Amino acid sequence: AGRSYIEHIPAAAIQEQLAAGRFTSSTDFSGIRRMDAVIICVPTPLNKNREPDISYILKSGEAILPHVHQGLLVVLESTTYPGTTDEDLRAVLERSGLKAGVDFHLAFSPEREDPGNPDSKVALIPKVVGGLTPACAQRAVELYSTAIKTIIPVSSCRAAEATKLLENIFRGVNIALVNELKQVYAAMGIDVWEVINAAKTKPFGYMPFYPGPGLGGHCIPIDPFYLTWKAREYGQNTKFIELAGEVNTAMPMYVVHRTQEALNAKKKAINGSRILILGLA
């Protein structure tokens, strides 16, 4: 007990909360009957066809289902497409015979964290909250206000779901842009890092992004495709997002190509060469 499997949450923090009686862990879902609120934060990967896989969300709903009771607040935090909370999760929970927004509360509040940044504290990161009804939203605001300084209510679960997607798509698209510029400027003999450092001195209308060997992490390479998939249901094309995905996906091969060029300049083959990678995380 007290061991953390999340890299940026030290075991000492878990042990401190355990000792203070503020945290307990259990695999017994019947305890939900004594709870005022349940927060679902499970993975939302893509399947082999690069389509959304919300099975972890639905299975969580099914685990909660037998224990849904009057007044319970259920909040989904997993990044997903608009409509997951008020359509898919709601349908599972209402099999209890209780009605969302009437008998129990349902809301969505996207997870926000900055892993790897020791100065980032969840309590200080504004929290977006959207409810199925105004009363649902108010209950979620009350819950999160006990731990987080600033709460940002929005009009619906869908607006909150779309907010998270916008945040991650914004990052993915801008990384793709600078990855493409990296290749263009390299061909011109221009140092893209020098250009970025000069551009970021502009105090308005610019935000620096940096090139790299593709996208990393659990979110940015995946989340944009949740929206591209859902958009097709509405007859909409997301060409910009999909093009950004293509650019970022191609970056590892660009790095290999540049490495090959550097070795060739030294009359060495990439096969059999020993290569030091700095900054690998």
What are these regions (language model features)?
Residues 1-281:
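Structural/interface elements that position substrates and couple domains in central-metabolism enzymes
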